[in-house]
């Protein structure tokens, strides 16, 4: 069951990860750029939300909590969405751990990406000026016997209801408003995302 119909076309480029060389008292150490940024409590959620990616993000959040449960974690999101169960594992971990998780949308946060964007700590959810956000209802497809199709259809409706409840909780919109707005794809600019309650403000420059 998916929260997005888009495919991730950028996975092959993940092999081209820059390395960072640091001088230490013991000599040189090399890190891939994402590991180096993890030391600064920065996590990237990019591309399709799927099980492997979700497990990596959950592991990074748990590691950073163990290192320092008082310092914020920064989750940068550029995602077209993905699998609901994978996204919910990230969502539940964000709510479970002690540090606040600040979310920042760069590029796009669509579907499950938008859901995770708005799930950040209140007052610490941001968009970059030219990013876009898209919300909609879960997508599902199943082939099989008629009875099984009916079972899966009921499950999709249950998931849709739960997602709408959580979106209403995080945005401050009424459940009825969320249900109307997610019936079809709804795209929002950064200012519109702020007005809707998906994020708290737009970041233009570092403080």
UniProtKB/Swiss-Prot annotation:
Q: What is its main location?
A: cytoplasm
**Effect of substituting residue 24 to A:** No ClpA-ClpP, little ClpX-ClpP complex forms
Keywords from the UniProt entry: Cytoplasm, Hydrolase, Protease, Serine protease, Stress response, Zymogen
What top-tier enzyme class does this entry carry? hydrolase
Give the E.C. number(s): 3.4.21.92
Q: Share an example GO biological-process annotation for this protein.
A: response to radiation
**Keyword Protease carried by entry:** yes
Offer a single GO CC term for the protein: HslUV protease complex
Q: Which Pfam families match?
A: CLP_protease
What's this chain's function? Answer: Cleaves peptides in various proteins in a process that requires ATP hydrolysis. Has a chymotrypsin-like activity. Plays a major role in the degradation of misfolded proteins. May play the role of a master protease which is attracted to different substrates by different specificity factors such as ClpA or ClpX. Participates in the final steps of RseA-sigma-E degradation, liberating sigma-E to induce the extracytoplasmic-stress response. Degrades antitoxin MazE.
Q: What is this protein called?
A: ATP-dependent Clp protease proteolytic subunit
Q: Which organism does this record belong to?
A: Escherichia coli (strain K12)
